[in-house]
């Protein structure tokens, strides 16, 4: 501003350009005063006034300065007071006049400098003014916001007060309702108890009634059996009486004849003829005797034959009433008869008796006279294979062999139905539907000759029919002749009328395939059932063919050349020239075309040029092939408009081509299997072109002379030679089209002849020529699936987006027929996916309508490349879409290409692709559509229906879960475990399941789902084994066996929002989770803070009931000690119980304190007393008890002597009163008395399995909680913990027991149990391990090696050192009494080292490696990581040099066989009698160590005798026995337990002492046996006689460096005693044999 003001002053001394610059600068800084507000104008005025004042002051100062300077220059140039002036004076005096400069500058320059300074100050002031203005504006805005916030705060405070009042009212109402509901609950609980009691009573009554009913049923069945037996006996007697009656009648008639003869003889005698009657009488008598004999023996046989035939006709009506039962395959338990057994076995009356109506006597005769060989209908095989109604089929039997089945009473109810001829699953006209269009006379002849059910079919089997009455030899001969004649005619007719069978491997060779399991493609005719003779007139009307009828095959026939009769135009046939015709499979729809397979190899003999064969289609049922269509070569039925139908469609097509046509089910490029090229070449060479079939003529004979027609024929047949010849002719129209508009290129593309298409395209045929329906060659090739033709046509610039008359594009047709390769080529060519038909359908609709998943995936995800330069250019990898990956996670691999508008496009009816997929039940297609994020499943059609409304059940479920949220449910264990129980062993949170929350899910459903998930999880982790939640094996009770249920839940967090079961919010669960971004549901269990132990139970897997019992013991008895093997969670349990007690006492209003003390070896009783006093647990006698609760936890008490530490405190702790004080002796000789008050609780932990020595004196003063490894809670803790760990890895799911993770976990559990079992047998309880060390077992799905590596680390760091220490401590109890335990451990002898290594090796093989889930090769790689897995044999052999006591005898160290000592493992040795040598003892010990086959007491020692083992060990140690030898024997007996057969599979056979084989599973082998070869049980030799041989064989093998042979045979439990007795005999042999064995072992070393 000052500058502006200054510039307004006239200054004539300035240059003109300076004035112009100042004017421009003033113009720039000028602003509009009118726009300023009043306050701004005031401020501007004040600023301008200040500047004016400043300008006046400056002017005055300048004037004064100018005056002063003028005076100074004129009058005061020289002033002595100023040295500057003196210097100036000298300067002026010393220089010339011209060189002198003025003393001061021009006043105008000074004025300009002052004005420049004023300008700068003006600029600074302006910037400061603008900043001040902006700050003022911000301050005003903040004031306004503050006022608004204050108003909102007041409003919210008022609302809060209102809500508080409402909430208070609601809370009061809820309290009242809760009280009412609690009363109701109690009433309902009482009612429920009453109802349950009544239910139990009713169950008991029902059980008694069921028992009575079962007893009555048993009685009734017994009575029925007795009645059946009596009836059978009565039937037998009746038959016998009938036979006897017949014999008697015959005898009576004979006697009557004899009487008549006697009368005649008497008359003759009377007449005087004495000689002749006397001679005839003996003959008659002789005849009479022979007749009587024949009647008695042959009568019943003749009658039995009559019984098979005569009553059959009478009982037909009766039999027809039976249920339809056609047994085809006899039961597996029926006995078999050899093939040479005759069929006329004498029947038994009780054999094959039916359980049906027994009133008619002829029915019984039918059954009683049945032969034991079943009728052929039982194993009947029709001419074309097994019958369609039979559940299974038997292979055909040869004619010379009788059916090898005998009917037993087990199938008696079916035998009568087998004998009944009228029951069959076939219809009388079942075969008529299979050959429509044939001559009725041929069908009638076939029907007639197949009508005889007794005729054997081509497989040599006969069907059952009523036997003929005439059994004379002449009738039988004629019957055989008739059968042969009918069989011959039937075979000829069957070959003529049925489609030819597949090519046999050898003409005339029998079929070796199993007809019942995999039927080959065969003839489709069915043989008519064998019923009574049918009238041989015309056959019954032909029923329509059923699509679901499974057509049974027939064995292949030799090639038969059938020549058609030219005069018979109505019969269909085909001329076959050494080609095998294959019928389509029976599962294809009607009208399948019959295709030609590969030509059989031609014979070397010269033949005429082959004529092209004609493919005929089997016409649909009910419509025969017309005479014109079958007799004329060029017949072509009218085709329905459009190419929407696949190659195998319902329309009947006759396509003469020698190329196997590709059906829509399995499209194959026809160009890759051109089998008729040689035929076509021969045809072209021979000039026999008129026989080529014209393809494109619709009815009538084809004009065979036209060249365009020949061109189309050659293109249709794929005759490249003829086509090239025709294309070389001049004047030929290659674009000629027939009446349907089909060009030669169209025909070649439709039939997939790629070479023909290439020739025509090179000849410049029109690539986009359309037929009368608008289809181009590309449309035809895409519809038929000829992707090679499609690729070729696209390369020649065919219109890929051409739409037919109905709007179908090539892409649409390819999607409709599911031609994947064609779709890929079209998409890569850049075809439009959004072209719509007249009906509004897109290719997406077509693909979904066909249910083709691959086509839909290609449409949605296949990206077209940027450009394709040439035909043979490879596809870029970016455009390739992996169908398999796309199915799993298409979003992860690529995003959908098609937009949301196309996926949601609706047709004329309003249906989208989702509607079509849902209505048809195509769940896979619908799932792919749902993965598109732009899908609108709520889109409605014109009938206002969504896809969900028209969907099937599966698709409805999919749509309902479309937008479902998968929220994991986790359980938090509450407090983290103290000390070394860190997060490595105890997971903070465990996933139990994932909830699917849908939009329609209510809070009630959500609460039920959470509760059910918790219940299922608790039951799953506490169940035995790996039982899935879906098995239904869990109880319906809410509590699990560990005591947890939904009542154990403290709170639930939905993300970060607290929620309680049954609580509802205004929003639905789905909206609530979405809005709050809740990613998980966390369940918190009640813990010690609430005075509960549920969280402790879940964290430690100790049952809640047991923890509550422990807590009750502490609260009731005040003094409790927890003891068990190391790692039994004693410290954790004690600490959690202390926390729970503390919070309970605090909730009751008491103050409580927990004092933890870790005891070590230097902890004295004085320090313990100070701890009691400082924690106010011990108070002076004069002081009254206080209300403070004190909980003292003493940990690691096993490190000190309990009797020394607690000896003085035992009485005061037990009697807590002033009468039983504890006296504290002070240093000055004074003492003070203290006592324990009732509010003090003492808990201790001991990591020791059992107490010994003086520590037992403390036992009676405390309550002891023993945590045994083989009892609860420790026994089930580890399985439950690891099962929960596995479920957490599998996100709450229980894997199948076959899963490798389950096997690995089971192996870890087995290691812990077997290890402790073996250590208990060894008598080393100090080495027992609790489950704590195994809680860190890694659970890595698919990587069992991680668990084995972890086991190796655990073995090397924990298990092996403990075992080594325990074994050394036991072996050195008597060895070095003077040195003590530490000296023995620090300097173990050589024998002790050997024993330790033996123990480690045995434990490793028996307890750790046994049952390892790894393969043998993988396990061998990890065995070296285990310490003690193998040790050198020299160390063990030096064990022989160890000195023994002189009184020890080898003879008395042998096993005693007295009955009194058989029950123990080892009888105490007697030292009274001296032995002949000590070498036998040494030999026996080392031989038993090296060759466990000599372990005499191996198999009868089991794991149940731990107590006797301990007693025996104590006795032997007390008698001064050699502890090392005892340990070796104990190790050996442990090694030869029942699981040895399994150990031998795991142990490495190449290590000398890793495999300990027992005599129960090692047979005698020679030295040449392959060690890997399994041995059959037949090769096992008696153990008693071959035991020395086994030892010598194993010795020789080890000397030769060959690994020892291990047996893989299991040891039956029943043979354990036998084996042990046999080995006893061998081990009790002379010592010389043992010495020899020892010598062998030395040589080996």
Curated annotation (Swiss-Prot):
It holds the Pfam family Ank. Keywords: ANK repeat, Cell projection, Coiled coil, Cytoplasm, Methylation, Phosphoprotein, Repeat, Synapse. One of its GO terms (molecular function) is protein phosphatase 2A binding. The modification Phosphoserine is found at residue 1521. This is Cortactin-binding protein 2. ANK repeats lie at residues 706-736, 740-769, 773-802, 806-835, 839-868, 909-939. Residues 407-417, 451-477, 580-590, 1558-1569, 1582-1597, 1635-1645 have a biased composition (Polar residues). The keyword Repeat applies.
């Amino acid at each position: 501003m000052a500058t502006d003001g200054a510039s307004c002053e006239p200054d004539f001394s300035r240059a003109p350009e300076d004035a112009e610059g100042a004017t421009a600068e003033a113009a720039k800084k000028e602003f509009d005063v009118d726009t300023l507000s009043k306050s701004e104008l005031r401020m501007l005025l004040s600023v301008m006034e200040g500047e004016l004042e400043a300008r006046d002051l400056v002017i005055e100062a300048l004037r004064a300065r100018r005056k002063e300077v003028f005076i100074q220059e004129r009058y005061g140039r020289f002033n002595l007071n100023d040295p500057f002036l003196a210097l100036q004076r000298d300067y002026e005096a010393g220089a010339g006049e011209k060189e002198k400069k003025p003393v001061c500058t021009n006043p105008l320059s000074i004025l300009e400098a002052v004005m420049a300074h004023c300008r700068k100050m003006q600029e600074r002031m302006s910037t400061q003014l603008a900043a001040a203005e902006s700050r003022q504006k911000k301050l005003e805005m903040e004031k306004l916001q503050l006022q608004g916030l204050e108003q909102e705060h007041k409003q919210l405070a008022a609302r809060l007060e209102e809500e508080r009042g409402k909430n208070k009212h609601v809370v009061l109402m809820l309290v009242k309702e809760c009280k009412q509901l609690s009363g109701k609950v109690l009433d309902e609980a009482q009612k429920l108890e009453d109802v349950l009691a009544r239910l139990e009573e009713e169950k008991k009554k029902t059980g008694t009634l069921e028992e009575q009913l079962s007893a009555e049923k048993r009685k009734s069945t017994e009575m029925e059996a007795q009645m059946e037996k009596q009836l059978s006996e009565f039937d037998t007697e009746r038959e016998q009486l009938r036979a006897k009656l017949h014999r008697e009648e015959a005898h009576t008639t004979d006697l009557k004849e004899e009487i008549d003869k006697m009368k005649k003889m008497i008359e003759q005698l009377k007449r005087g003829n004495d000689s002749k009657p006397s001679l005839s009488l003996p003959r008659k008598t002789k005849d009479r005797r022979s007749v009587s004999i024949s009647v008695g023996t042959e009568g019943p046989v003749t009658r039995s034959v009559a019984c098979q035939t005569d009553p059959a006709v009478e009982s037909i009506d009766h039999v027809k009433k039976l249920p339809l039962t056609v047994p085809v395959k006899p039961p597996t338990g029926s006995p078999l008869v050899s093939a040479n057994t005759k069929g006329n076995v004498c029947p038994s009356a009780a054999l094959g008796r039916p359980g049906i109506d027994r009133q008619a006597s002829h029915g019984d005769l039918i059954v009683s006279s049945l032969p034991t060989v079943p009728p052929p209908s039982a194993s009947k095989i029709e001419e074309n294979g097994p019958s369609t109604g039979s559940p299974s089929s038997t292979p055909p039997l040869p004619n010379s062999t009788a059916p090898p089945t005998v009917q037993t009473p087990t199938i008696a109810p079916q035998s009568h139905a087998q004998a009944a001829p009228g029951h069959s699953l076939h219809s009388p006209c079942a075969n008529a539907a299979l050959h429509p269009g044939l001559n009725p006379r041929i069908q009638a002849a076939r029907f007639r000759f197949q009508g005889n059910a007794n005729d054997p079919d081509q497989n040599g089997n006969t069907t059952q029919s009523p036997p003929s009455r005439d059994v004379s030899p002449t009738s039988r001969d004629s019957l055989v002749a008739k059968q042969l004649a009918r069989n011959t005619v039937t075979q000829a007719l069957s070959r003529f009328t049925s489609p030819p069978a597949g090519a046999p491997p050898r003409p005339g060779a029998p079929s070796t395939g199993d007809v019942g399991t995999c039927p080959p493609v065969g003839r489709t005719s069915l043989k008519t059932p064998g019923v009574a003779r049918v009238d041989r007139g015309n056959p019954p009307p032909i029923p329509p063919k059923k699509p679901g009828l499974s057509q049974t095959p027939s064995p292949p026939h030799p090639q038969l050349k059938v020549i058609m009769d030219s005069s018979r135009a109505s019969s269909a046939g085909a001329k076959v020239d050494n080609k095998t015709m294959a019928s389509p499979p029976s599962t294809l729809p009607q009208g399948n075309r019959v295709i030609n397979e590969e030509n059989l190899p031609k014979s070397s003999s010269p033949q005429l040029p082959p004529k092209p064969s004609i493919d005929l289609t089997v016409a649909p049922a009910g419509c025969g092939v017309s005479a014109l269509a079958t007799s004329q070569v060029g017949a072509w039925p009218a085709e329905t408009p459009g190419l929407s139908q696949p190659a195998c469609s319902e329309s009947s097509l006759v396509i003469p081509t020698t190329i196997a046509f590709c059906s829509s089910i399995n499209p194959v490029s026809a160009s890759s299997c051109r089998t008729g090229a040689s035929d076509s070449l021969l045809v072209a060479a021979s000039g026999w072109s008129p026989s080529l079939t014209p393809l494109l003529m619709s009815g009538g004979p084809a004009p065979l002379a036209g060249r365009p027609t020949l061109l189309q024929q050659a293109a249709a047949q794929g005759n490249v030679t003829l086509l090239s010849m025709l294309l070389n002719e001049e004047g030929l129209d290659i674009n000629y089209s027939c009446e349907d508009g089909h060009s030669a290129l169209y025909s070649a593309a439709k039939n997939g002849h790629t070479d023909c298409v290439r020739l025509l395209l090179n000849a410049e045929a029109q690539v986009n020529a359309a037929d009368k329906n608008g289809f181009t060659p590309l449309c035809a090739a895409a519809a038929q699936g000829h992707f090679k033709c499609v690729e070729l046509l696209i390369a020649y610039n065919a219109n890929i987006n051409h739409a037919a008359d109905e709007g179908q594009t090539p892409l649409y047709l390819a999607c409709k027929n599911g031609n994947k390769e064609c779709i890929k080529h079209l998409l890569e060519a850049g075809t439009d996916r959004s072209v719509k038909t007249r009906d509004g359908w897109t290719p997406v609709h077509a693909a979904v309508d066909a249910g083709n998943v691959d086509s839909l995936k290609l449409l949605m995800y296949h990206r077209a490349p940027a450009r394709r330069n040439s035909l043979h250019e490879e596809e870029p990898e970016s455009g390739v879409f992996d169908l398999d990956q796309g199915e799993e996670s298409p979003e992860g691999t690529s995003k959908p290409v098609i937009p949301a508008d196309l996926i949601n496009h609706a047709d004329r009816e309003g249906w989208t692709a989702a509607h079509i997929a849902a209505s048809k039940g195509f769940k896979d297609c619908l799932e792919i559509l749902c993965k598109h994020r732009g899908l609108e499943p709520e889109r409605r059609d014109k009938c206002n229906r969504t896809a969900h409304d028209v969907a099937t059940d599966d698709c409805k479920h999919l749509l309902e879960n479309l937008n479902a949220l998968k929220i994991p449910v986790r359980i938090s264990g509450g407090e983290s475990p103290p000390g070394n129980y860190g997060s490595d062993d105890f997971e903070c949170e465990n996933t139990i399941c994932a909830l699917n929350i849908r939009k329609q899910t209510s809070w009630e459903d959500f609460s039920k789902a959470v509760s059910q998930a918790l219940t299922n999880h608790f039951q799953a982790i506490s169940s035995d084994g790996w039982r899935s939640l879906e098995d239904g094996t869990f109880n319906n009770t809410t509590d699990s066996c560990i005591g947890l249920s939904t009542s154990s839940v403290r709170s639930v967090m939905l993300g970060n929002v607290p929620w309680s079961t049954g609580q509802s919010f205004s929003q639905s669960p789905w909206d609530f989770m979405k809005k709050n971004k809740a990613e998980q549901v966390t369940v918190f269990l009640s813990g010690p803070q609430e005075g509960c132990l549920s969280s402790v139970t879940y964290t430690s897997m100790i049952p809640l009931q047991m923890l509550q019992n422990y807590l009750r013991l502490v609260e009731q008895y005040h003094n409790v000690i927890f003891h068990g093997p190391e790692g039994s969670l004693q410290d954790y349990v004690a600490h959690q119980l202390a926390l729970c007690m503390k919070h309970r006492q605090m909730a009751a209003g008491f103050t409580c304190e927990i004092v933890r003390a870790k005891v070590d070896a230097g902890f004295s009783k004085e320090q313990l007393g100070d701890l009691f006093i400082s924690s106010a647990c011990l108070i002076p006698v004069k002081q009254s008890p206080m209300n403070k609760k004190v909980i003292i936890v003493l940990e690691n008490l096993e490190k000190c002597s309990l009797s020394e530490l607690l000896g003085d405190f035992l009485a005061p702790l037990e009697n807590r009163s002033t009468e039983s004080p504890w006296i504290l002796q002070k240093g000055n000789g004074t003492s003070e008395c203290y006592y324990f008050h009732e509010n003090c609780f003492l808990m201790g932990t001991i990591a020791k399995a059992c107490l010994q020595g003086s520590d037992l004196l403390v036992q009676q003063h405390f309550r002891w909680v023993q945590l045994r490894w083989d009892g609860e809670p420790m026994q089930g803790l580890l399985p439950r913990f690891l099962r929960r760990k596995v479920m957490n890895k599998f996100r709450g799911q229980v894997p199948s027991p076959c899963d490798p993770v389950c096997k690995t976990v089971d192996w870890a559990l087995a290691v812990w149990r077997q290890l402790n079992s073996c250590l208990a047998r060894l008598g080393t309880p100090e080495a027992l391990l609790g489950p704590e060390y195994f809680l860190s077992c890694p659970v890595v799905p698919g990587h069992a090696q991680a668990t084995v590596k972890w086991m190796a680390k655990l073995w090397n760091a924990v298990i092996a050192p403990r075992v080594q220490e325990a074994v050394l401590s036991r072996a050195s109890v008597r060895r070095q009494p003077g040195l003590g335990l530490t000296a023995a451990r620090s300097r173990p002898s050589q024998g002790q080292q050997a024993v330790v290594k033996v123990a480690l090796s045995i434990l490793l093989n028996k307890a750790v490696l046994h049952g390892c889930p790894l393969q043998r090769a993988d396990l061998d790689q990890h065995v070296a990581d285990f310490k003690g897995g193998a040790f050198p044999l020299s160390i063990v052999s030096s064990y022989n040099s160890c000195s023994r006591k002189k009184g020890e005898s080898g003879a008395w160290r042998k096993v005693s066989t007295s009955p009194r000592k058989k029950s123990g493992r080892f009888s105490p040795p007697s030292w009274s009698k001296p032995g002949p040598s000590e070498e036998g003892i040494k030999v026996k010990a080392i031989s038993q160590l090296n060759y466990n086959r000599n372990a005499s007491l191996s198999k009868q020692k089991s794991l149940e005798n731990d107590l006797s083992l301990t007693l025996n060990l104590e006795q032997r140690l007390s008698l001064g026995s050699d502890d090392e030898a005892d340990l070796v024997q104990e190790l050996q007996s442990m090694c030869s337990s029942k699981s040895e057969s399994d150990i031998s599979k795991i142990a490495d056979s190449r290590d000398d002492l890793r495999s300990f084989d027992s005599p129960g599973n090692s047979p005698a082998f020679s030295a040449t046996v392959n060690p890997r070869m399994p041995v059959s049980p037949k090769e096992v030799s008696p153990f008693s006689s071959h035991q020395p041989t086994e030892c010598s064989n194993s010795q020789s093998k080890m000397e030769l460096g060959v690994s020892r042979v291990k047996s893989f045979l299991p040891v039956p439990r029943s043979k354990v005693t036998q084996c042990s007795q046999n080995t006893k005999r061998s081990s009790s042999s002379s010592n010389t044999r043992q010495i020899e064995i020892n010598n062998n072992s030395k040589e080996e070393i």
